[in-house]
Amino acid sequence: MTNIRKTHPLTKIINNSFIDLPAPSNISAWWNFGSLLGICLILQILTGLFLAMHYSSDTTTAFSSVTHICRDVNYGWIIRYMHANGASMFFICLFMHVGRGLYYGSYMFPETWNIGIILLLAVMATAFMGYVLPWGQMSFWGATVITNLLSAIPYIGTNLVEWIWGGFSVDKATLTRFFAFHFILPFIVSALAAVHLLFLHETGSNNPSGIPSDSDKIPFHPYYTIKDILGALLLILTLMVLVLFSPDLLGDPDNYTPANPLNTPPHIKPEWYFLFAYAILRSIPNKLGGVLALAFSILILAVVPLLHTSKQRSMMFRPLSQCLFWLLVADLLTLTWIGGQPVEHPFITIGQLASILYFTILLVFMPVISIIENNLLKW
């Protein structure tokens, strides 16, 4: 009798995705982040669900309801901090996952890559709306500043912003709809993640060498299941150390002050994982220009496959491209630092230079260096 695992319509899908899936024999720890993102998503949905049971999406009670969760609900504090810091872990894994894709040429699977970009945008939207829900000072002013950027769109801008707000300022209607969207989006992300996997399993995984691995495949279970479990344990350990020892390390103190439309905080800034994009936005003195640069800072990922000029897929055997990649990482860290600094003399210039460098590396240096490396192969 054939194993039910391989014949039953439901278990067959799981079997073909996580058990008998043929996987390259040489994929490194950089391939762990996909499963870690899945764990992050499940964790966020579960903790978020329990938070939603006690949260009130009304401007008069939102801040108090979050305080109530932390003080009065059984283990509410740990659920709240796991959710807040879980978002940070989610983005760390996301950035590593995208970085891996750029380094090893995984963007050569166009469907998987493009759905990945849509996933990134959806998770960013979810995180932004989640940050508004506690209704602290940074929640309110962050929502005001970021939604206001849409007013830079010619002709329809102002109407669009007022439509999103549900009034003439960020108020009760805005908070209620943000809660509704924040609740539904993770489930849309889950569906997109399933499609992401579906397209990945059409082609099979890439591997560090960038060379087709059809001649040397191993079953996913037990080799990569045990590897993923190790990754998951490290992820949960890191998260719990953050939650239990310094839960407010990555947060903003201003968010412990209830939202006040009459008092603007001295430095309005988003959560740390948006600072690189925020720095790019601020580095352009023109409003529409800044908004376009902000959008393109993420959408540029869609252009990367079109600019792949190298004869090799991966950067494993391309030292010049490797140097450029790590320069890009350093540049993004610089932008993250600048995004959290006030708009003053040295920081403005550093931010502008870092923004120019970011786009130049991806649009100019990468393709040019790849062509140079192709010519070096002839020597």
UniProtKB/Swiss-Prot annotation:
Subcellular location(s) of the protein: Mitochondrion inner membrane
Residues involved in heme b b566 binding: 97, 196
Free-text cofactor note: Binds 2 heme b groups non-covalently.
TM region(s), chain numbering: 33-53, 77-98, 113-133, 178-198, 226-246, 288-308, 320-340, 347-367
Pfam families for this protein: Cytochrom_B_C, Cytochrome_B
Keywords, in A-Z order: Electron transport, Heme, Iron, Membrane, Metal-binding, Mitochondrion, Mitochondrion inner membrane, Respiratory chain, Transmembrane, Transmembrane helix, Transport, Ubiquinone
Binding site for heme b b562: 83, 182
Membrane topology: Multi-pass membrane protein
Main location (coarse class): mitochondrion
GO biological process, one term: mitochondrial electron transport, ubiquinol to cytochrome c
GO cellular component, one term: mitochondrial inner membrane
Cofactor: heme b
PROSITE patterns for the chain: CYTB_CTER, CYTB_NTER
GO MF terms, alphabetically ordered: metal ion binding; ubiquinol-cytochrome-c reductase activity
Annotated residues for binding of a ubiquinone: 201
Job description of the protein: Component of the ubiquinol-cytochrome c reductase complex (complex III or cytochrome b-c1 complex) that is part of the mitochondrial respiratory chain. The b-c1 complex mediates electron transfer from ubiquinol to cytochrome c. Contributes to the generation of a proton gradient across the mitochondrial membrane that is then used for ATP synthesis.
Similarity-based family: Belongs to the cytochrome b family.
Additional detail: Heme 1 (or BL or b562) is low-potential and absorbs at about 562 nm, and heme 2 (or BH or b566) is high-potential and absorbs at about 566 nm.
Quaternary organization: The cytochrome bc1 complex contains 11 subunits: 3 respiratory subunits (MT-CYB, CYC1 and UQCRFS1), 2 core proteins (UQCRC1 and UQCRC2) and 6 low-molecular weight proteins (UQCRH/QCR6, UQCRB/QCR7, UQCRQ/QCR8, UQCR10/QCR9, UQCR11/QCR10 and a cleavage product of UQCRFS1). This cytochrome bc1 complex then forms a dimer.
Name used for this protein in its record: Cytochrome b
Organism: Melogale moschata
Gene: MT-CYB
